Amino acid sequence: MSVSVLSPSRLLGDVSGILQAASLLILLLLLIKAVQLYLHRQWLLKALQQFPCPPSHWLFGHIQELQQDQELQRIQKWVETFPSACPHWLWGGKVRVQLYDPDYMKVILGRSDPKSHGSYRFLAPWIGYGLLLLNGQTWFQHRRMLTPAFHYDILKPYVGLMADSVRVMLDKWEELLGQDSPLEVFQHVSLMTLDTIMKCAFSHQGSIQVDRNSQSYIQAISDLNNLVFSRVRNAFHQNDTIYSLTSAGRWTHRACQLAHQHTDQVIQLRKAQLQKEGELEKIKRKRHLDFLDILLLAKMENGSILSDKDLRAEVDTFMFEGHDTTASGISWILYALATHPKHQERCREEIHSLLGDGASITWNHLDQMPYTTMCIKEALRLYPPVPGIGRELSTPVTFPDGRSLPKGIMVLLSIYGLHHNPKVWPNPEVFDPFRFAPGSAQHSHAFLPFSGGSRNCIGKQFAMNELKVATALTLLRFELLPDPTRIPIPIARLVLKSKNGIHLRLRRLPNPCEDKDQL
């Protein structure tokens, strides 16, 4: 029996043929993909012909214009040039339509469109599918289940805990005054708001502001903020597998692990405590139920409890949303008051007449500082903690001016653009608290620091209380002055940050009690 042996030349010929066939197949697939992208872009151009926008690159869209932390400045220019809405082209023929008109906002927020899957999904490895990312009936069930955690009776005792956390931060600032240099406040405020969340929502004993281990969690959250935002804008990081192989993907994985270790520890400690305390009625007689108690003890409509996965997702979501957005709000409020000393002093006079030296602040005080509240709202208008929120249209929509968008379009409700829209807010860059004076006329959707509609921020009242407590106690202790050498540059991340930090000079104010003692 003879055995045929392939010659090297024949073997090379076979390999060459396979490679040629593979190359042709790849070229064909690329051609098909290119045609699909072209046809999709043509469809989008036709669908958006009623919405003019600046010239864009055929492949990279407006990405290059918005890459160098200039997005907010660009949005302000587009708001002035293009009425109500403006398409923002991304790489590869993708587009999102920026909305910054209150009538447009009202239409979208009155619908039940899901969060945009394209960009929000990048948050899932970090915060899971909790209240922020869920859609449809599951979201509705979770929202209804969590609403009791934000009832007034639950929130009232939190005011004292908030004040305790703020005082720890202010004491630290007093110690740093001797260094005679401006203070970067965001990091301090972020640690304070995390401390507040831990005390109020998770009944943590002590203060994590003096616990160095908490710094790693704060850093992980800061890193994830930047990493997720950068990934959304990077055409090569959209695929999960490819992203996991990059340095940014590995960094994201490590940061997620740190964040999850923190929340897992919080959950396990509470589970052990609940087992010791016994039945629900016995627990209620001992103490108030907090956010974590309600999560662990609540049941879904079908009688089942939350799975460990769902539980961690809700805790991670609230941990992030409850401290990072509030930290942004407080930091920018303090900066706004530092740059407007007359308004700062008027707030201080109001707070001093109400609280004296601030030794005690309660729930009832929070509705008795109208001018301070006006200043807080005006700062939130200028510096909204969440610059924008996305929706993917589940059905076509027609706006009040007759223009329409088809199903499947991604819209970005630009809260920053809305708050800086000169047609909505005359002289939008001017700090004017009297925009929010009692009786002032406003469109119902002109001011949306906590979003709006059925998916508005569930912790809105909690956050507003914390903003008031932090502002009041800080103004009683310090005079705030800006650092003229480092003016903050707002940049859009998951929350509104400053590219170069928020640096303030602090001047210790005399304590009225100390003055009396000297007399």
From Swiss-Prot:
The record's Gene Ontology cellular component field reads:
apical plasma membrane; cytoplasm; endoplasmic reticulum membrane; intracellular membrane-bounded organelle
Q: Which cofactor does it need?
A: heme
How does the UniProt record describe the way this protein sits in the membrane? Answer: Peripheral membrane protein
| Residues binding heme, per UniProt | 321, 457
What Gene Ontology terms describe what this protein does at the molecular function level? alkane 1-monooxygenase activity; arachidonate epoxygenase activity; arachidonate monooxygenase activity; arachidonate omega-hydroxylase activity; heme binding; iron ion binding; leukotriene-B4 20-monooxygenase activity; long-chain fatty acid omega-hydroxylase activity
Note how its activity is modulated. Activated by cytochrome b5.
Q: Does the keyword Membrane apply?
A: yes
EC number(s) stated in the UniProt entry for this protein: 1.14.14.1, 1.14.14.80
What are the residue ranges of the propeptide?
A: 1-4
Kindly list the biological process annotations in GO that this record carries.
Answer: arachidonate metabolic process; epoxygenase P450 pathway; fatty acid metabolic process; icosanoid biosynthetic process; kidney development; lauric acid metabolic process; leukotriene metabolic process; linoleic acid metabolic process
The record's subcellular locations are: Endoplasmic reticulum membrane; Microsome membrane
Question: Main localization of the protein?
Answer: endoplasmic reticulum
Quote the pathway field.
Lipid metabolism; arachidonate metabolism; Lipid metabolism; oxylipin biosynthesis
Key words, A-Z: Endoplasmic reticulum, Fatty acid metabolism, Heme, Iron, Lipid metabolism, Membrane, Metal-binding, Microsome, Monooxygenase, NADP, Oxidoreductase, Phosphoprotein
Reading the lineage from the top rank, the first entry is Eukaryota
Tissue spec. comment: Expressed in liver. Expressed in S2 and S3 segments of proximal tubules in cortex and outer medulla of kidney.
- Using the record's annotations, give every residue carrying the modification Phosphoserine: 440
| Recorded catalytic activity of this chain's protein | an organic molecule + reduced [NADPH--hemoprotein reductase] + O2 = an alcohol + oxidized [NADPH--hemoprotein reductase] + H2O + H(+); an omega-methyl-long-chain fatty acid + reduced [NADPH--hemoprotein reductase] + O2 = an omega-hydroxy-long-chain fatty acid + oxidized [NADPH--hemoprotein reductase] + H2O + H(+); dodecanoate + reduced [NADPH--hemoprotein reductase] + O2 = 12-hydroxydodecanoate + oxidized [NADPH--hemoprotein reductase] + H2O + H(+); tetradecanoate + reduced [NADPH--hemoprotein reductase] + O2 = 14-hydroxytetradecanoate + oxidized [NADPH--hemoprotein reductase] + H2O + H(+)
- Pfam families reported for this sequence: p450
List, alphabetically, the CDD domains matched: CYP4B-like (cd20678)
* The UniProt record lists the keyword Secreted: no
What family is it from? Belongs to the cytochrome P450 family.
What's this protein's function? Answer: A cytochrome P450 monooxygenase involved in the metabolism of fatty acids and their oxygenated derivatives (oxylipins). Mechanistically, uses molecular oxygen inserting one oxygen atom into a substrate, and reducing the second into a water molecule, with two electrons provided by NADPH via cytochrome P450 reductase (CPR; NADPH-ferrihemoprotein reductase).
* PANTHER family, per the entry: CYTOCHROME P450 4A11-RELATED (PTHR24291:SF39), CYTOCHROME P450 FAMILY 4 (PTHR24291)
| Listed name of the protein | Cytochrome P450 4A11
- Gene name of the record: CYP4A11
